[in-house]
Swiss-Prot record:
InterPro entries in the cross-refs: Scorpion_toxin-like_sf (IPR036574)
Tyrosine amide modification, residue list: 60
Organism: Centruroides noxius (Mexican scorpion)
Record family assignment: Belongs to the short scorpion toxin superfamily. Potassium channel inhibitor family. Alpha-KTx 10 subfamily.
Protein name, as recorded: Potassium channel toxin alpha-KTx 10.1
Site entry: Aromatic residue of the functional dyad, important for the interaction with Kv1.2/KCNA2 channel: 58
Major localisation: secreted
Additional facts recorded: Negative results: does not inhibit Kv1.5/KCNA5 and Kv3.1/KCNC1.
GO molecular function: potassium channel regulator activity; toxin activity
Entry comment describing in which tissues the protein is expressed: Expressed by the venom gland.
Source organism superkingdom: Eukaryota
Keyword check for Secreted: yes
Cellular component terms (Gene Ontology): extracellular region
Propeptide: 23-28
Length: 62
């Protein structure tokens, strides 16, 4: 029973860590002007623009 609890805690820790860092950086490595806005919208952001050769996604809000 104690082994199952340890495994569950380890899996929970890994899941939370992966989920936290999955959207850590919302900038793509190279910006393609035609697809930047589409890619950002597909990921759940309001819009996207190419800034300094990087696709910057803008969230909903102000």
């Amino acid at each position: 029973m104690e082994g199952i609890a340890k495994i569950t805690l380890i899996l929970l820790f890994l899941f939370v860590t992966m989920h936290t860092f999955a959207n850590w950086n919302t900038e793509a490595a190279v910006c393609v002007y035609r697809t930047c806005d589409k890619d950002c919208k597909r990921r759940g952001y309001r819009s996207g623009k190419c800034i300094n050769n990087a696709c910057k996604c803008y969230p909903y809000g102000k």
